[in-house]
Each structure stands twice: as structure tokens, then as C-alpha cells.
């Protein structure tokens, strides 16, 4: 199917009617299930834009999106009315994607709660009755497993409540889990023995270790970083040279970054003085080698 948004005659007449509030109100009063209808104050119908729908979906939709206030005035419900003049097998999943996009748009407006979005498919194709399931979970190879996965709470790995002894048994992921669990601890020295044990097992490569140490420098207690590395190195002689090499590499990178940041700050100070003395903008740029975006910060 090509990504064309050109409406068919079927789509055009459908939208002409459904874009009219009075017509849409009658449609919803007649076709919404009673429990849902009772939740909606249909006198508050408001036509919503659909430009937020991702580009890959727009070609497939002849959609109408209405919002209504709830009967108690405490929230909103959205009704997606989709038109089809021929049956399409994966329509349920597309409607689900549309519904979640509408939910996201609602939250982007600043609302905390996720709104109900009611998808309705209006169908008048040659094949009758409509031949496909409109439960999107039926589109999976294993619908029963899909129901179990998507109608229950999602899986959670809350490492904050996993005992350290249990984490130590997690093979190649143990070091990451242990460090991230304790990264906010005031002093990581107490973790040295466990970390050393994990390093001796040989599950961590140099790239991972350097990234992990850099993470400790950025998010942990930097004042104790050197002692932390030295303690680990002393407890694992076979890893000592490797650990100290990585630590030194990080220090050099840190010095280089600090030097570059210092030079940049100095250039900004020079630019500020030049601008104050009336130098042309182009001369300031050429002299300091700052980018054009840096100059406004100098005013």
C-alpha cells in the first residue's frame, strides 16, 4: 500500500458526515455500548486533530477523532471512528496503534492520567459480515500468551530489592546490577570485595570495565574513586595492571576534557571583552574560533 493520503469517494462522504458534531453525536448515541455511553457527556463533543499520528500510519487511516468530557466532568474519553470500505486483516493492531498515539497526545498536554480511547470501525465492504477479529491480541501467533503478557502487569526487574548475594549469582550481568543498585551509596568501598570477586570470574571485558569506571566517576563519590580502584587492584593481583591502566586512561581523558572546557571558557571571556570594545562579530568569530551559536552567550 502506498503512502498516499488521497481520500477515496467512500472516505470523503464518510468524513463529510462524521465531521459534523450533530451527526457524530447521533452515531455515538446509537452505536456506543450502553456502559460506555453512560460515561460520556455527548453534548461536549469536540473534533480533535489527527496530525499527531505517525507518518507511516496516515496513509491507512480515514479517521475521525472526537473527544468528550466524562459525565461527571472529571476527565476525557476519546472516540476513534475509522471507516473501511474493504476488510483488512490487521486492522485491530492499527487501531491499537492509533489509540495509543491519542493517549500519548493527551498526556503531552500535561495530563497525568491516561484517557480511555474507544476505537470504532465503520465497515461497508463487499464481504459480509466483517471477516476478521477486532481484538488485536488475536493477531499474535499465540493469542493466549499475548493476553497473559499484555493484560497483566509488565515484567519488572527492581534491582533495589534483590539481595546482593543473589545478584552475585547473575554471571555476566552481576557487576552492572551491583554497581547500579549501590551507585547512590555514600561510600562504595564496602562493595570492593564483591566487585573483586566478580572481576576475578572474568566476565567483564575492558570496554565494559572502562565504561563502568567512567560511570562511577560521573555518578558516584568521585572523591574516593582513586582509593576505590586501588582497593580493588590490591585484592586482585592478576587484574591489577589491567585495572590501573583503565583508571589512568580515564584520568587522562578527564584532564583532556577539563583542558578543552577551560580553553572554551577562556575563548568566551575573550569574545566578551572584544564585543564590549566594539569589535565586529565576524572578527570575534575568526579570532576566538567560536561557533556562531556561542556568540549570543557572550552578550
Swiss-Prot record:
Biological process per Gene Ontology, one example term: DNA recombination
A Pfam family: Transposase_31
Molecular-function GO term, any one: double-stranded DNA endonuclease activity
Similarity section: Belongs to the Rpn/YhgA-like nuclease family.
Purpose of the protein: Upon expression has no effect on RecA-independent DNA recombination, cell viability or DNA damage.
Protein name: Inactive recombination-promoting nuclease-like protein RpnE
Organism listed in the record: Escherichia coli (strain K12)
The encoding gene: yfaD
